[in-house]
Amino acid sequence: MSGGLNMVYMLLGTGFEETEAVAPIDLLRRAGVSVAAVGIGGKVIVGSHGIPVTADMELGQMDLTQLDMIVLPGGVKGVASI
């Protein structure tokens, strides 16, 4: 845990911008922050450039009692699907 953060959830919807999701997840985890990629509509989500990403969990599995931050990556279709 870093900076008092318990959990950060990165919401991934079909068409999300891959670099806007994967790079922040990587950097936050390197800093010791707990980050989970959350798939909207399944665990395997396809980004805006056709790259499939396997989420850590699906939307219904989020523990909101531990939530500190939700991150929404860009991508027109990804944002619309969230």
Predicted segments, located by residue:
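Extended, subdomain-level signal for the structured scaffold at the beginning of enzyme domains
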Residues: 1-82
